[in-house]
Amino acid sequence: MGRIPAGDIPARENIFYQSVVTFCLSVYTLELFPETMPARNRAVIAVGVLSIAVFVYIMLSTDLLPLLGVHLPLLPAQAYVKMGSATLAAFFCFWYFRGLQNALIGLILISALFWVLEFLSGHLGMFGGTYSYTDAFPGPSVGGTPVFLGLEHYAYYFFMSYFIANLLVDGVIVSSPESWWKRALFVSFISSAIVMGIDMMADPVQVNAFQQWHWAGGSPYFGIPYGNYVGYILIYTFVLFAFKYLELRFHAQEMGTPVLAIACVPLIMHFSRFLEYASTELPGLTIVGCFTMLLPCILAWDRLFAYFRKLPPVA
């Protein structure tokens, strides 16, 4: 594929920025929020949408557009902004659909729990053996385990799998509490399978392309131990089931009527991660990702649009 001449890049960037402005104005004129929506609800949605927009811009400017010869300005402290924007997008989406209390519980408990699990697993080899992180992983470390690992699990695994599983299993953004424990256990298992599917792309990229950590032992699958994926299924099934119990215990509920702008945030993030991993061009990884990430994402989009088509018009 031919590269764009250097002299044409500023013009292309200018066209890109004009397109972004035009898109934002179009969204505004189409009334992103219902007219009767309270200001607080609008603010929560706006922050969530803005956060995912920043995340997508970073992914495009860093991973995808350079392959096409288009180079956009990089943000300062981009690795930190990327993690921060993903975390904010996840938190505000949870806030809108599950309430502030449950959103805070998810952010704090999931981030802390998975950091501890990563620390123990890395040192004790709980699933698949021990591993050690390198300086390529962004952010500071404590005891050899990066601080941002907990937030990464929260935004990139827990958040995306939670909403996608609800859509795939029940065709809704938030599952019904009826017969909750049977349904919750099944949805939690599907969520863990989605997490495993994400990690089947994420780990090969982070280990082989980004060199962010090294396994003491591996397997023929890009050097990632198979036990690592078994661990994801077991741990995430239990954790997501426990979170659904806490939702019931603390009466989680939506702030208002479902709005597509905030409902599509987890799917946008999921698809963006697929593109990011696929852009590394590791042999065979994109084919794997088409089944483990792209297919569930497409099915979830279809279920999401079907869900909104059934909703009554909002004034």
Briefly describe each language-model feature range:
Residues 24-315:
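Aromatic-rich, lipid-facing transmembrane alpha helices and their immediate juxtamembrane interface loops
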Residues 8, 14-17, 28:
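Intrinsic-disorder-associated, low-complexity terminal segments enriched in Asp/Asn/His/Tyr and depleted
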Residues 20:
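Non-catalytic, largely sequence-independent nucleic-acid-binding elements associated
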